[in-house]
Amino acid sequence: MSIELHKIYKRKKSDRDIFQELMPFKIKEILLIANYYDAYTIEREGQFTDKIVGEYLQVNLYTAPRFTSVASEAEALKILSERHIDLIILMAGLDKQTPLVISRHLKDLYPNICQLMLVNNNSDLAYFHTIEDRLYESIERLFVWNGSTKIFLVMAKYIEDKMNLDRDTHLGDIRVILLVENSIRYYSRYLPLLYTEVMTQTQELIFSEPQDNDMSIVMKIRVRPKVILATNYEEAVYVIDHYRENLIGVISDVRYKRNGEEDEEAGIELIRYVKRTGAYIPCMLQSQEIENAVKAEELHAAFINKNSPTLAHDIQDFIKGYLGFGDFIFRNKNGEPIDRATSIEEFKQKLLSIPDESTTPFATVFLPG
């Protein structure tokens, strides 16, 4: 009897119910551990909290997490004993040893709280590469300060997406974008671009459709695609295998670890792996080596130069053109555009008049118009 009632409940669950249950893990409280000098590097250009709130409001996220800043392990332990903390961020600058010691101590005492580390600049990364094994015993991921407080929004969203991925894809059929990049410097640069563009495009889709009173815009924004970061071949394959039905795009570097060894063609092999699944998943290779553009073309994948001055625009073009955020382009059997729809309503109307050949799966793939 209870099984039947459960089935009835599931069948009658409305969109609003599903939206409300998405993103059950939200980062509301962040503990920032930084000595006074390191804290100064991020606060010297203005009010830190105001800037964080501004970053959230810029992408229509109306509730920013609260930051509590401390300068020592003793202060951190006091805060942790007094209130619930969702995420710990440790800054490492001139003093690189103390944050590591604090991190290990906190991991022993609070193993379920995610810890991320933020280094002051790219030159500090060389040191952390030499101690990777010890570093990742307590630190989930390393990021590099790029001069913008947007990196804090990205760090919070990175953890939220990772924690909510399994539940949200099963409950709400949420889409997934996979970024494969092992360079801390580059993923610290890419992720802010990706999150900003995904959130902006999601909002444009929401605002382009008639709004109902039963569902707030804030709630609908929860259906934005998850952005998942992998740093080696095996991590990427795991995401592809487990979330293939939800995957709408793969952006991959060319060189990273495969089978534990640096592989100069790991990204090439990954795109081939995606193609072998038989699913239509748009792929983009990104590399500093321009000659890899030829390999990308052979794989029918897009390509961008990692050092391009138009990097942000190139990523925007890929997301709008290939991941379903841009206009829907109707094409004939030769792939030539014959019409376009800018909204769901317009799409429905155009379906009544376009040739049958333009409604085949081949002809209705999202491509740049």
Q: Each predicted region: which residue ranges?
A:
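Non-catalytic signal-transmission and effector/linker regions of two-component phosphorelay proteins
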Residues: 1-68, 132-226, 233-234, 246, ...
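Conserved phosphotransfer microenvironments
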Residues: 6, 10-12, 41-44, 48-53, ...
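Hydrophobic beta-strand segments of well-ordered beta-sheets in folded domains
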Residues: 27-33, 85-90, 113-118, 139-142, ...
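Structural motif
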Residues: 33-37, 90-94, 118-121, 146-147, ...
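Residue-level signal for alpha-helical context at structural boundaries
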Residues: 94, 124, 173, 208, ...
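Alpha4 helix (beta4-alpha4-beta5 surface) of REC/receiver domains from two-component response regulators
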Residues: 96-101, 105, 117-143, 149-153, ...
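Amphipathic alpha-helical segments that form the core helices of the histone-fold
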Residues: 364-369
